[in-house]
Amino acid sequence: MEKIGYLNFIDHTIELEEKFLPQFTEGTSQHSLLRNRIQALKTARDLISRESQPTRDELEFALPRIESIIHKMSKARDKYEPEDKNYKRFDPTVQVMTHVRAVILQALEE
């Protein structure tokens, strides 16, 4: 997948998660989790697009949230065989977030 593909995927994911945010009461753990995940995705988008350079604190904040997405999507994906439609539904998220994690780790090393 190319840079534009990653950015489109991340933007689409942000849009979907922002639609779910109002369903949770502010102050609940679900609301905080989703808000933090959206912020992590926005940080990743900024880093990959080079629109702005996220701070070290923003990158350190984003990394565990991205790793959480990878973990949860991998567990969901691995319940299915690679030919299954559900496997194919979860796999792109795992691949994109794995790339995002690598980019964040690289930025943190610099």
Regions found by a protein language model. Name each.
Residues E2-E18, L34-R37, T55-S74, T93:
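Short amphipathic alpha-helical heptad-repeat segments
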Residues E17-L21, R45-D46:
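Short charge-dense sequence patches
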Residues K19-L33, S52-R56, K75-R89, L108-E110:
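Charged, low-complexity interaction regions
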Residues Q30-E51, K85-L108:
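Short, charge-rich amphipathic interface segments used for partner binding and complex assembly
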Residues P64-D78, Q95-E110:
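Compact DNA/chromatin-associated regulatory and scaffold domains in nuclear/nucleoid proteins
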